[in-house]
Curated annotation (Swiss-Prot):
UniProt EC number: 1.18.1.2
Family recorded in the similarity comment: Belongs to the ferredoxin--NADP reductase type 2 family.
Top-tier EC class: oxidoreductase
Reactions that this protein is recorded to catalyse: 2 reduced [2Fe-2S]-[ferredoxin] + NADP(+) + H(+) = 2 oxidized [2Fe-2S]-[ferredoxin] + NADPH
An MF annotation (GO) of this entry: ferredoxin-NADP+ reductase activity
Record-given protein name: Ferredoxin--NADP reductase 2
Assembly with partners or alone: Homodimer.
Amino acids binding FAD: 14, 33, 41, 46, 86, 121, 289, 330
Lineage: Bacteria, Pseudomonadati, Bacteroidota, Flavobacteriia, Flavobacteriales
Keywords on record: FAD, Flavoprotein, NADP, Oxidoreductase
Cofactor field: FAD
InterPro entries according to UniProt: FAD/NAD-bd_sf, FAD/NAD-binding_dom, Fd--NADP_Rdtase_type_2, Ferredoxin-NADP_redctase_2
Length: 354
């Protein structure tokens, strides 16, 4: 059985940063994730997608953010159970927990932090009868490596941020980019909508609104998409393509976590955000996109903040008789479990009394 101080379910950015905040408090951590590598969606779905709202990083690729977090937490030597899904939660008489995965791996900890992002997730697929026949043969629901689309004819379907952002990005990569949306209005960020409109005027993106992709054609690989216009006079058109990317978001599923007795609201875990992001089960916390409370913002930086607050509460729960005195890392440095220590260089600027 694996024993630790804080058992973190979910190894996305929020889960990884929890390791750092716990490490500053000398708390050991272990992470469980169903994916085969750390990083969550940032690694699995869009490692090459730029992120613009991480403090001090005007722009950083999602995969690079994960790499930086892994380097930041390395001194605290976290444990990982990867490729396994947290299946059951058992509360013991002493208030601690045993979490067992779908492969039977058992973990014991006094504190459990659910940082599973959206939980398990599946792409929302358009109702095209033969779409499964072309998956990985021209149809993709995620963009992991934009270079795959270099000099290709690409059709993107969707009207949200992902569809807009990837249309903008692939305009510099693909030979042709068409963005198909069933409405005339888009639901994404205003600057993204404006940028797509600018690129459309320059002929670098073709915007096809009030239309839907309703069919796919090809022998072994995708060769054409069938686009149906709401304007019956235009009817249907057959467009030659190399790749079709429907981006209709993810369908979040809490999976087995949903049966742990947690208070759930709209497929998210309710927490007490006035104090420490604890759930209705004492000792079980939920941080990051998986939780919900009034005013919740599903941002990576929000997850980082929640992780810091949660770890302070976890420390008091594990050591109720100890009082932790907050020390800034600029003063106390960062002392890892591997014996390393990072600290500011101390220099004498002026001797006292001289």
């Amino acid at each position: 059985m694996i024993k630790t101080d804080i058992l973190i379910i979910g190894a996305g950015p929020t889960g990884l940063f929890t390791v750092f905040e716990a490490g500053l408090l000398k708390l050991k951590t272990h992470l469980i994730d169903a994916l085969p590598q750390p990083g969550g969606q940032c690694s699995e779905i869009y490692p090459k997608k730029p992120i613009y709202d991480i403090p001090a990083f005007p722009e950083i690729l999602a995969g690079d953010l994960v790499s930086n977090l892994m380097e930041q937490i390395r001194p605290f030597k976290p444990g990982f159970t990867l490729g396994e899904r947290a299946e059951t939660l058992e509360k013991l008489d002493d208030g601690s927990f045993i979490v067992t995965t779908n492969k039977g791996t058992q973990h014991h900890a006094p504190v459990v932090a659910i940082a599973g992002g959206l939980g398990s997730f599946e792409p929302r697929k358009p109702p095209i009868p033969n779409i499964a026949d072309f998956e990985d043969k021209g149809v993709s629901y995620f963009i992991k490596d934009p270079e795959v689309y270099r000099d290709k004819k690409v059709v993107i379907a969707g009207g949200g941020d992902s569809a807009l952002d990837w249309a903008i990005y692939l305009a510099d990569v693909a030979s042709e980019v068409a963005l198909v949306h069933r409405r005339a209005e888009f639901r994404g960020a205003l600057d993204s909508v404006e940028r797509v409109s600018e690129l459309a005027k320059l002929g670098r993106i073709e915007m096809i609104t009030n239309a839907e992709v309703v069919g796919l054609r090809g022998e072994d690989n995708l060769e054409q998409v069938v686009i149906r216009h709401k304007d019956k006079a235009r009817g249907e058109e057959f467009r030659d393509v190399d790749d079709f990317i429907p981006l209709f978001g993810l369908s979040p599923k809490l999976g087995p976590i949903g049966s742990w007795g947690l208070e759930i609201e709209r497929n998210a875990i309710k927490v007490d955000n006035s104090y420490d992001y604890q759930t209705n089960i004492p000792g079980v916390y939920a941080i990051g996109d998986v939780n919900t409370y009034k005013g919740k913002l599903k941002l990576i930086l929000s997850g980082f903040h929640e992780a810091a607050i949660m770890c302070q509460s976890a420390y008091q729960r594990i050591y109720p008789d100890k009082k932790y005195v907050l020390k800034y890392t600029t003063v106390g440095g960062v002392e890892g479990f591997d014996g390393t220590k990072k600290e500011a260089k101390k220099e004498v600027v002026q001797s006292i009394g001289v």
